[in-house]
Amino acid sequence: MIGLIGRKVGMTRVFNEDGVSIPVTVIEIEANRVTQVKTLENDGYSAIQVTTGTKKASRVTKPEAGHFVKAGVEAGRGLWEFRTEGEEFTLGQEINVDIFADVKKVDVTGTSKGKGFAGGVKRWNFRTQDATHGNSLSHRVLGSIGQNQTPGRVFKGKKMAGHLGAERVTVQSLEVVRVDAERKLLLVKGAVPGATNSNVIVKPAVKA
């Protein structure tokens, strides 16, 4: 089953039948319009390309505009692709949030909030060094980053200070709390990556 592109609206809470508060993220999923159907014969694999939302005509490049016109759909805020397995789709077809009506759990992919340059304590949850006992400068410093003449280098992948956030992150197996097809909303339990109004990709959970 394919996924859908949505917009992270924010977080709130809902109450179940027992009156228990459930923290949920609200994802607005407007109709996803099919802009291209890729086939095994023509493209080497089966997939559909979709768009959603709207974009000002002045913000659409000529190649993009031609692509949208060929598909017979309104220009959207981006293009995304989902692999297909036997499902039939047509150009211009609209796919709505109600495809998740019978789905129990979903995987949500987004771009995490950028935090800029961060030290090891914030970026990797390193513990801090002694506050006193002779330590006057190295309270939040990494400490040793390697050995001696052997191997004589710092290994690749060593956890160090650097850029934190602003990367693609997937949170798996989030419970679907509610599907509101009328208002085009999907409520999932817990937090999803990204800032408010950012694009997120919602797919049925692979581990469900």
Swiss-Prot record:
CC terms in the record's Gene Ontology section: cytosolic large ribosomal subunit
Post-translational modification: Methylated by PrmB.
GO biological process, one term: translation
Modification N5-methylglutamine occurs at: Q149
UniProt-listed Pfam families: Ribosomal_L3 (PF00297)
GO MF annotation list: rRNA binding; structural constituent of ribosome
Xref: InterPro entries: Ribosomal_uL3 (IPR000597), Ribosomal_uL3_bac/org-type (IPR019927), Ribosomal_uL3_CS (IPR019926), Transl_B-barrel_sf (IPR009000)
Superkingdom of source: Bacteria
Keywords: Methylation, Ribonucleoprotein, Ribosomal protein, RNA-binding, rRNA-binding
UniProt key word Transport: no
Quaternary data: Part of the 50S ribosomal subunit. Forms a cluster with proteins L14 and L19.
Family, as annotated: Belongs to the universal ribosomal protein uL3 family.
Function: One of the primary rRNA binding proteins, it binds directly near the 3'-end of the 23S rRNA, where it nucleates assembly of the 50S subunit.
Protein name in UniProt: Large ribosomal subunit protein uL3
Species of origin: Haemophilus ducreyi (strain 35000HP / ATCC 700724)
Lineage: Bacteria, Pseudomonadati, Pseudomonadota, Gammaproteobacteria, Pasteurellales
